Amino acid sequence: MFDGYSIRAKQVLFLARLESGARGAEMLDLDDLLTGLIIEDQNVIPSALARLGMEGQFMGSPEHHAFLPADTATNVLENIHQSHPRSQPIPHSTDMPISSDLGEILAAASELRKELQSKEVTPLHLFAATMRRSHSGIQALRNKGITEEGVIRAIRKEDLG
């Protein structure tokens, strides 16, 4: 299902699964994806994994510059973490379904990859597809000047270089 995804995009989805399981959710949703995107974007995967109880060596992702300003990323993450009730964590080994919203976002990211003729789906494709949604975390990003058009410009720049 994720053959056309970059290593970084797969890491985002892995982080989304860990975040969802940590809060005891029944399925992965937009907040989990947004959390995974921000953690990966800000290059804080090792500390997030430690917070989520994952031990061992982390195989790092390719070097990249953060797309989001650090203060914006921190504020959105804090709001997401505060807005969800916590219940019994779901074991890492348990498969979790994805919400229909998240399924639509993944499909939109794949379509965007084709439309832009990108080699693979990257975290920026996922960000762009996410920006089409009506959601408090997305609105917080818009309020800071992050737009779908801006993300698409960043994808085009990434594809060139």
Tell where the protein language model's regions lie, with residue ranges.
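Histone-fold recognition with a strong bias for associated Lys/Arg-rich disordered tails
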Residues: 1-161
